């Protein structure tokens, strides 16, 4: 009886499909057109969602005004830079300036300071990160800073990591927003309690860094077939810290909401573009928190800031690639910040 019932159901289903197909053939568009229409609607919905979120980013951007004084639109500190890695902190700090911060500081190891100073006279460089009193030297600047970017060019020297651990602790005590990238994320993977539950932290891991964090925090491998769920779960496990997983599409979550940034970029993946993202994010986080949830329509200010930084980085990548193709570097991308910012947020 079971076999007959199953066969009967299958026959009935086939009849229904045949009737629907005949009706579509006579009175409606072909099935492939229906599917194409459904896909187009979903794509249009996605584009609309992105545009709505970009509008929230526009809402948090402070207007330029001759009545403001130097420093009002952002004083950002970058913590990182060692003997081996001097480019990353420069990229992050100069990107912060290009996006619209008024002042950009770099707190680096003494060996990195002359090199970073030589890159740009516009950066304020402090050669203190490897000193015995590094935490105190950075802490005394915290009242003057609106946000920290921790990790670019940091390296994994034990003494530097201990100092950065102390800097993160005093920054949390002062309620300073922190963006954590690169080897700052390696430190967090070793000590997740450092930022657990700190709602003014944003983590910006790439695929490898995300996998390491996920395994350290959730004690198991991530589900490669469920990227959205993996980012959501990691954020929740960290106490709803905002997480930005960089990749073909950037996936963002604060443990309650998931956003996807699919702004067009390019197929070029040059080293350093993550530093552009972290530096610009430091500025946007400050602006978003200053603007408050009323300007973000109730959405998380940090999620809105992160979406803006991801969109900007991708747009810079796209514009630079149009000019330079395979030879595109992060310096080419940084040169596009002004035009990309205007295109996304000021048109």
Curated annotation (Swiss-Prot):
Glycans are attached at residues 240, 297. ATP binds at residues 246-250, 265-274. Pfam families: Carb_kinase. The modification Phosphotyrosine is found at residue 85. It comes from the Eukaryota. Residues 53-344 form the YjeF C-terminal domain. Its cofactor is Mg(2+). Transmembrane segments: none annotated. It is found in: Mitochondrion. GO terms for biological process: metabolite repair; nicotinamide nucleotide metabolic process. Its main location: mitochondrion. CDD domains: YXKO-related. It is an enzyme of class 4 (lyase). Its EC number is 4.2.1.93. One of its GO terms (molecular function) is ATP binding. Keywords: ATP-binding, Disease variant, Glycoprotein, Lyase, Mitochondrion, NAD, NADP, Neurodegeneration, Nucleotide-binding, Phosphoprotein. Changing residue 81 to S: In PEBEL2; decreased reaction kinetics for ATP-dependent NAD(P)H-hydrate dehydratase activity; decreased affinity for (6S)-NADHX; changed ATP-dependent NAD(P)H-hydrate dehydratase activity; thermostability assays show that activity is lost at temperatures above 30 degrees Celsius. GO terms for cellular component: mitochondrial matrix; mitochondrion. It catalyses: (6S)-NADHX + ATP = ADP + phosphate + NADH + H(+); (6S)-NADPHX + ATP = ADP + phosphate + NADPH + H(+). InterPro entries: CARKD, Ribokinase-like. Catalyzes the dehydration of the S-form of NAD(P)HX at the expense of ATP, which is converted to ADP. Together with NAD(P)HX epimerase, which catalyzes the epimerization of the S- and R-forms, the enzyme allows the repair of both epimers of NAD(P)HX, a damaged form of NAD(P)H that is a result of enzymatic or heat-dependent hydration. It is linked to Encephalopathy, progressive, early-onset, with brain edema and/or leukoencephalopathy, 2: An autosomal recessive severe neurometabolic disorder characterized by severe leukoencephalopathy usually associated with a trivial febrile illness. Affected infants tend to show normal early development followed by acute psychomotor regression with ataxia, hypotonia, respiratory insufficiency, and seizures. Disease course is rapidly progressive, leading to coma, global brain atrophy, and death in the first years of life. Belongs to the NnrD/CARKD family. This protein may be expected to contain an N-terminal transit peptide but none has been predicted. This is ATP-dependent (S)-NAD(P)H-hydrate dehydratase. It comes from Homo sapiens (Human). The gene is NAXD.
């Amino acid at each position: 009886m079971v076999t007959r019932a199953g066969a009967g159901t299958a026959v009935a289903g086939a009849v229904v499909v045949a009737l629907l197909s005949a009706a579509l053939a006579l009175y409606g568009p072909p099935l492939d057109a229906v599917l194409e229409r459904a896909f187009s609607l979903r794509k249009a919905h996605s584009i609309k969602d992105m545009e709505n979120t970009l509008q929230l980013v526009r809402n948090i951007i402070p207007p330029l005004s001759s009545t403001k004084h130097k420093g009002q639109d952002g004083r950002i500190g970058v913590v990182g830079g060692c003997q081996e890695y001097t480019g990353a902190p420069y990229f992050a700090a100069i990107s912060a300036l290009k996006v619209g911060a008024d002042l950009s500081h770099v707190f680096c190891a003494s060996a990195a300071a002359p090199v970073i100073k030589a890159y740009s006279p516009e950066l304020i460089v402090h050669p203190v990160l490897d000193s015995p009193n590094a935490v105190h030297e950075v802490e005394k600047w915290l009242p003057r800073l609106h946000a920290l970017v921790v990790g670019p060019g940091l390296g994994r020297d034990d003494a530097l990591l201990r100092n950065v651990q102390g800097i993160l602790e005093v920054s949390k005590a002062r309620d300073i927003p922190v963006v954590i990238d690169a080897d700052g994320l390696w430190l967090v993977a070793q000590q997740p309690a450092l930022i657990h539950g700190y709602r003014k932290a944003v983590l910006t891991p790439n695929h490898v860094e995300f996998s390491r964090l996920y395994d350290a925090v959730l004690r198991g491998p991530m589900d490669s077939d469920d990227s959205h769920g993996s980012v959501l779960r990691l954020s929740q496990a960290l106490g709803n810290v905002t997480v930005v997983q960089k990749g073909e599409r950037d996936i963002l979550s604060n443990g309650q909401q998931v956003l996807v940034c699919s702004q067009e970029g390019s197929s070029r993946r040059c080293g350093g573009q993550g530093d552009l993202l972290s530096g610009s994010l430091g500025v946007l986080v400050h602006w978003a928190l200053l603007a408050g949830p009323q300007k973000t329509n109730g959405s998380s200010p940090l999620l809105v800031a992160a979406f803006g930084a991801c969109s900007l980085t991708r747009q810079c990548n796209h514009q630079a690639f149009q000019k330079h193709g395979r030879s595109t570097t992060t310096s080419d991308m940084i040169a596009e910040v002004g035009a990309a910012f205007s295109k996304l947020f000021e048109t």
